[in-house]
């Protein structure tokens, strides 16, 4: 008989060895000095799906960051040099930066404390929601909005459900590796539920429906196996897995900025709403059609508050109302912490990316204020703020979320 301790050690070893290694990977920073150079970078991204662009905008002077595998580094640098693009090596040892995140999280703390000090796993998040529904039954209810491809429960929490209230729908975690987004959603839940008396101005006339993890399969995979996994986990071919959930919504689906290559990080999916995860968002929002006045999707990273359209540089007819809400969030954060957020339409600030959730919510679900908030980055690369940074980021983000919700409450 194999001693139990040996079995445990072998199990731990199996988990450790299953992790994807980023040994030899580097992250490069490139600052385009003109719109033409920014366009060159965009074209490099479009024609090289193996390059993982962590950050890329149209704005000259805004540093792009690219994760590059050892096999691609020489050819990538040749491209940059050929086009006269200046670069620097931002992270020379990507694997080395991941060690703190591969260590087991210390248990024994209460979940409410964990919300702003560590990244909860999906089962812990659902446990937290359930605990709140039991502790505050008159304020909170929890429902299953859907089931992921691998069978995980996708839950929503409804806070302060009252007839006639305008509804705020907030989601996070469409992209697996953006851990700070679910952490921020959880902090918003904590503030609205456990500190409700301090947040009555955004509770008295508003009902909140929050889906803290849209893509639980990818989220768990990014914790257990591949820290920088972005997509869902449903197979999309013989060798590839996953779809970019934020290219999978059925509004101008499959158009500009959405890849047809199944292995690409921006793969649009085999059809619109091919993923059970995006269907869960669709169904939850459509149930609220008419009463939902504010759709907010949390992403990272990059200090942006963005709104439609993502498929064209044209603006919606009612863009000024959306911009007013977005500007309220940006100004509140600036006044509170000094951090500056860029506000504008997705295509004009970043790049065109059709099939996004905010475009769909605005055009199809008819939510009048539809916004994507790109949260601050952290750590060496951007996607990996250390646990010590969570509290600062979620506090700052809540200031902006609360200000936007207050503006919506005043409008509707």
From Swiss-Prot:
Residue positions assigned to the propeptide: 19-75
Q: Where is the Peptidase M14 domain?
A: 118-408
Look at the named UniProt entry and state the broad enzyme category this protein falls under. Answer: hydrolase
Tissues/organs with expression: Expressed in midgut (at protein level).
Q: Which cofactors does the annotated protein need, by name?
A: Zn(2+)
Q: What top-level branch of life does the organism fall under?
A: Eukaryota
Annotated family = Belongs to the peptidase M14 family.
Q: What is this protein called?
A: Carboxypeptidase B1
Source organism (scientific name): Aedes aegypti (Yellowfever mosquito)
Recall the taxonomic lineage recorded for the source organism: Eukaryota, Metazoa, Ecdysozoa, Arthropoda, Hexapoda
Q: Which gene encodes it?
A: CPB1
């Amino acid at each position: 008989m194999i001693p139990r301790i040996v079995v445990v050690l072998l199990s731990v070893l199996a988990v450790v060895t299953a992790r994807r290694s980023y040994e030899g990977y580097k992250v490069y920073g490139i600052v385009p000095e003109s719109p033409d150079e920014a366009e060159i970078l965009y074209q490099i991204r479009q024609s090289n799906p193996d390059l993982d662009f962590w950050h890329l905008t149209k704005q000259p002077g805004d540093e792009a960051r690219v994760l590059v595998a050892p096999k691609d580094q020489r050819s990538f640098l040749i491209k940059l040099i050929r086009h006269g693009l200046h670069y620097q090596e931002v992270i020379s040892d990507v694997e080395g930066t991941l060690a703190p995140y591969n260590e087991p999280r210390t248990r024994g703390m209460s979940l409410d404390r964990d919300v702003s000090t560590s990244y909860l796993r999906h089962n812990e998040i659902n446990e937290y929601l359930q605990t709140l529904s039991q502790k505050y039954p008159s304020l909170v209810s929890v429902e299953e909005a859907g089931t992921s491809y691998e069978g995980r429960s996708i839950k929503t929490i409804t806070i302060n459900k009252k007839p006639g209230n305008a509804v705020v729908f907030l989601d996070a975690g469409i992209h697996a590796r953006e851990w700070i987004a679910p952490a921020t959603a959880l902090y918003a839940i904590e503030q609205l539920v456990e500190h409700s008396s301090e947040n009555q101005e955004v509770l008295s006339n508003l009902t909140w429906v929050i889906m803290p993890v849209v893509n639980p399969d990818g989220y768990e995979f990014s914790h257990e196996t591949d820290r920088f996994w972005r997509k869902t986990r449903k197979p999309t071919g013989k060798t590839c897995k996953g779809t970019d959930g934020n290219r999978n919504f059925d509004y101008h689906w499959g158009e500009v900025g959405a890849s047809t290559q199944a292995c690409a990080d921006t793969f649009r999916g085999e059809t619109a709403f091919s993923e059970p995860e995006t269907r869960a968002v669709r169904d939850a929002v459509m149930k609220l059609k008419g009463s939902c006045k504010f759709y907010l999707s949390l992403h990272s990273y990059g200090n942006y508050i963005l709104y439609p359209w993502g498929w064209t540089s044209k603006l919606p007819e009612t863009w000024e109302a959306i911009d007013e809400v977005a500007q309220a969030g940006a100004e509140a954060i600036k006044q509170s912490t000094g951090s500056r957020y860029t506000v504008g339409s997705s295509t004009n600030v970043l790049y065109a990316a059709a099939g996004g959730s905010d475009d769909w919510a605005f055009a199809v679900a008819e939510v009048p204020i539809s916004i994507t908030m790109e949260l601050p980055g952290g750590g060496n690369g951007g996607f990996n703020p250390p646990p010590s940074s969570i509290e600062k980021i979620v506090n700052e983000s809540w200031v902006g979320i609360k200000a936007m919700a207050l503006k919506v409450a005043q409008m509707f």
